[in-house]
Amino acid sequence: MKLCLGCMEQMEDSVTTCPHCGFNEATFTQESYYLTPGTIVGGKYILGKVVKYGGYTVTYIGMDAEKNQKVMIKEYLPSEFSTRSAGEKEVTIYSGDALELFNQGLTTFLNEANRIQHLEDPKGIAKVYDCVAENDTGY
C-alpha cells in the first residue's frame, strides 16, 4: 500500500491514479517554488499537493506519519519577499528590506501559530497541532 499525495488515502502500490480523488503523481504538475509532494517536514509530516496559496502562505494536504492522521500544513512563503528553487527545500529570502520584512512576518506567523496551538477551545479557528521552523521558513 502507498499513500496518495493528493488526498492522503491509502491505495494499492500498483495503482497509478488514486481511486479516491483521481490524483496521478506521474502527470501532476505544480509551481516549482512549492515543496515537492512527498517531502517530509518536522520529521513526521508528509506533504502532499498544494490545496491553496494565498497572500503569504501555501497550504498543503498532509499526513502526520506518527499519528496516521490527515492534516493541513501551512508554510510561510510570501512571494514578494522570498522564493524557492525547483527541487530545493530551503527558501531563498530576497535581500535588503525584503529580508527584514520576511523575518518579521515569519516571527509573527510562528508566534500566532504557537498561541493558537495552546488555546483551550479555539472557536472558529482551525486547530494547530504543531509549529515547525525548518527550511529557513515556518510551518
Task: List PLM regions with ranges.
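Short cysteine-rich clusters marking metal-coordination/redox-active sites
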Residues: C4-C7, C18-C21
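Short beta-strand micro-motifs within the conserved protein kinase catalytic domain, predominantly
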Residues: K127-G138
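Cys/His-rich microdomains that often coordinate metals
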Residues: Q10-M11, E25
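A short, low-complexity linker immediately N-terminal to eukaryotic Hanks-type protein kinase catalytic domains
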Residues: F28-L47
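Conserved N-lobe loop of protein kinases adjacent to the ATP-binding glycine-rich P-loop
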Residues: G62-V71, Y76-T83
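Flexible N-lobe loop architecture of eukaryotic-like protein kinase catalytic domains
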Residues: K52, N111, E120-G124
